[in-house]
Amino acid sequence: MSSMQFSSVLPLEGKACISPVRREGSASERLKVGDSSSIRHERASRRMCNGGRGPAATGAQCVLTSDASPADTLVLRTSFRRNYADPNEVAAVILGGGTGTQLFPLTSTRATPAVPIGGCYRLIDIPMSNCFNSGINKIFVMTQFNSASLNRHIHRTYLGGGINFTDGSVEVLAATQMPGEAAGWFRGTADAVRKFIWVLEDYYKNKSIEHILILSGDQLYRMDYMELVQKHVDDNADITLSCAPVGESRASEYGLVKFDSSGRVVQFSEKPKGDDLEAMKVDTSFLNFAIDDPAKYPYIASMGVYVFKRDVLLNLLKSRYAELHDFGSEILPRALHDHNVQAYVFTDYWEDIGTIRSFFDANMALCEQPPKFEFYDPKTPFFTSPRYLPPTKSDKCRIKEAIISHGCFLRECKIEHSIIGVRSRLNSGSELKNAMMMGADSYETEDEISRLMSEGKVPIGVGENTKISNCIIDMNARIGRDVVISNKEGVQEADRPEEGYYIRSGIVVIQKNATIKDGTVV
């Protein structure tokens, strides 16, 4: 095995992009700028150049060489940047959402970030895991409505789940009634941060925080936030918006942006309609390298992910726009006129879980082969509550394109293109197709099940010979025998709480703890 040597060269002048190079014989292959592997190589080389102490203080270039033959030589060249973004100088604020009306009835007893997704995760696990995988471990979660299950999940997963915070922390800040206020609830995204500005200010002074990362708790994506923060630092931006290309059909659901050739945002329009929407169209051909047929995505949408300079955020919320309550609709459109507001275009998978339809479609997409998004990645895993459940037990089942979580009991059933949550029970002859079953909080013993059935009651799970399609089944639902749930008549909207279900965008949603009696047809 050849030995490896490290050599530092003189500081470079100027500012350039990352350019790691692997030499193989006489050829050189340049890694794509922004590629995750190149970013990891860059960070590793900085640590080696700086004795493992984190970001280098100067522009020293690190060259990794070998005493092997020239054909085997590996040169890792990190181009100069004046300032490397340090995750220790970043604090993340995750917004817990409002009343959750768009995801009702899933939010009838829980906050939006606590809604289960992907079989065993919660929506809050997405930004939390992205933070940890990005090296950001100073996190505030702001909650208000129905926050009990969210607080419990955060405590079990991130405060007692074995995750190593080193010098970091996770703090839950709940909306409270303040003296002299007419209402204690957050009146918007900016107002949520403003209500706890005194907590954040005290924290910033003690922890040398320079950048504030604002995140949403109702989205599905995997992102290295430090790439976003690095662009923020490189551009000397006051505010940086993470943006994504979107198509015509959903463009009016988002805040849309336009930016110039330097990346500076010159126009921001919150959920435009009609002519205002048409005016926000842009030429997205510059995304040819990243997505197929960019002409299908003629709009650039704000993801609701922002980076602020600390002092800029404090000034905007306390002084400049002290009476404004929302970042997207009020503060950002005004701030871009006298602040350096930059755009960071994110081209990987991103889904805003804003409605029952988008939530259902995002979950069903996880079942596709190959899926557009996967929770599993050994280098950037998603964390969730450790439940210590046994593997799922199945007997004579037919399963196709499905995700089956831990601790389930499946007996002579058929599952197709569906997600089955933890502790689910499906009995003989039951069929699920295009369905999401969230599972149960606890098991019922065989004796308990026998007793319930002898009393004419329904145990937790799906009963014998029940057929379910295009449906979301919330936690602890009790669905009897010979039930058919398919919305055969194509009803788009319906409220049937007394019968245990709602219909939203044609999707039947069985309520949490609902009981659907034997023989019911929906």
From Swiss-Prot:
EC number per UniProt: 2.7.7.27
GO molecular function: ATP binding; glucose-1-phosphate adenylyltransferase activity
Ranges for region Disordered: 28-54
Pathway(s): Glycan biosynthesis; starch biosynthesis
UniProt cross-references to InterPro entries, sorted A to Z: ADP-Glc_PPase, ADP_Glu_pyroP_CS, NTP_transferase_dom, Nucleotide-diphossugar_trans, Trimer_LpxA-like_sf
The family this protein is said to belong to: Belongs to the bacterial/plant glucose-1-phosphate adenylyltransferase family.
Name of the molecule in the record: Glucose-1-phosphate adenylyltransferase large subunit, chloroplastic/amyloplastic
Organism this protein belongs to: Triticum aestivum (Wheat)
